[in-house]
Design a protein with these regions (language model features):
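Short, surface-exposed, charged amphipathic helix/loop patches that serve as local interaction elements
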Residues: 2-264
């Protein structure tokens, strides 16, 4: 019996400790427009995001073969999975509220998710077109994506004056508008969808005919409206990354997007 006890004691000594699963890294960020809490009528602007993990990667990979998933929907899914809260709204139980954010706020969350996942810098490989050598390219997440701000009121409908002097109110597009627009089969159809969703009618009945109304607008009025609703630039500026090849010194220009930055 004593031998059994000794053996059990030795087994206990050499057992590997149970792995400790660390809490995911989180980042706090301020949004410019934020999310309206319908219960309080207050705008919530403080958001918390976490790093992307293997579960997120597997889920997102499962969407890649789905032809019905647009880029806007895919990016929205990334944000809804990695955003913990906006104000006191927990996103895990209210994922659809991400579609109520303007594009600039959504992109601000994406930069925060990038920082939570990779730290202050993101390094990835990119081939040189001149010599075909693979280069390690490092992006400084804070410096390379400067946050644009505006004095424009991002929360209230605004006036747009049409060609014949008619004044109509419009709102800024949010995620759900961008998702609906992305399903248009042409740029013209996408413009129609966006205009029809952003016009603010005094009478709710008029909204039933918004798409047909948008189709019947003259091109000058359509362009005026699109310039107005897409005009305010807020959030991180996503553009080109310029570097040089470490082997042949040729200039390398990289057009980055959020999906490749986060998952490539």
């Amino acid at each position: 019996m004593s031998n059994t006890i000794e053996t059990e004691s030795m087994d206990e000594m050499f057992k590997d400790p149970a792995p400790v699963i660390a809490n995911p890294e989180s980042v706090i960020v301020e949004l410019q427009r934020g999310l309206l809490n319908p219960a309080t009528g207050q705008w919530q602007t403080t958001a918390e995001v976490r790093e992307l993990n293997g579960k997120d990667e597997e889920f997102l990979a499962s969407l890649e073969g789905n032809k019905n998933i647009t880029y806007a929907m895919y990016v929205g899914t990334i944000v809804s999975r990695a955003t913990v809260r906006i104000g006191d709204t927990l996103i895990k139980n209210n994922k659809s509220v991400i579609d109520e954010l303007i594009t600039g706020d959504r992109d601000t969350l994406l930069v925060a998710i990038l920082r939570a996942t990779y730290g202050p810098e993101r390094t990835f490989k990119y081939p040189c077109e001149a010599c075909k050598t693979s280069n390690d390219v490092t992006i400084n997440i804070e410096e390379d994506f400067p946050i644009q701000t505006t004095t424009f009121n991002l929360r209230e409908p605004f006036d747009v004056t049409l060609k014949k002097g008619e004044v109509l109110k419009f709102k800024l597009p949010v995620g759900s508008d961008n998702i609906a627009m992305s399903k248009g089969e042409s740029i013209a159809q996408q413009s129609t969808l966006l205009i029809s969703r952003c016009v603010v009618w005094k009478d709710h009945k008029d909204s039933l005919y918004s798409e047909e109304w948008a189709k019947n607008l003259g091109l000058q009025d359509r362009n005026t409206i699109l310039s107005a609703i897409l005009g305010p630039k807020v959030g991180p500026k996503l553009g080109e990354v310029n570097t040089q090849c470490a082997t042949c010194s040729a200039d390398i220009v990289i057009n980055v997007d959020w999906v490749s930055l986060l998952l490539a």
